[in-house]
């Protein structure tokens, strides 16, 4: 998915506005994904998946950090997430659809906490960005 200059500006603007909340939003998005799509829990049998779990928050922080890294390197998302793509494809073997589910949950969390930021145009740009991230993370699945 090709991001236009306007998309890139919109995505960078979202991450600038959510700033220090990205980690909390990542944890909330992950918790929302587990609640809305219970089969995604199968990849985390060793986690305490209860609401507010420190393990879910910690993994949410990793998710948010990866999204921030991708946004900061929006012209080279594949390069920025190459190691993460290798990890998920070769070691963890996460079902690729889960990246799209998590992206959707992240959009929902941003909409809940920052409704004024998520105009229709920004929503579309952020959705395209999250789809691009999902595509990069699944590119090495073969």
UniProtKB/Swiss-Prot annotation:
GO terms for cellular component: blood microparticle; haptoglobin-hemoglobin complex; hemoglobin complex. Keywords: Heme, Iron, Metal-binding, Oxygen transport, Transport. The keyword Endoplasmic reticulum does not apply. Heterotetramer of two alpha chains and two beta chains. Belongs to the globin family. This is Hemoglobin subunit alpha-A. It comes from the Eukaryota. Residues 2-142 form the Globin domain. O2 binds at residue 59. CDD domains: Hb-alpha-like. The lineage of its organism: Eukaryota, Metazoa, Chordata, Craniata, Vertebrata. Involved in oxygen transport from the lung to the various peripheral tissues. One of its GO terms (biological process) is hydrogen peroxide catabolic process.
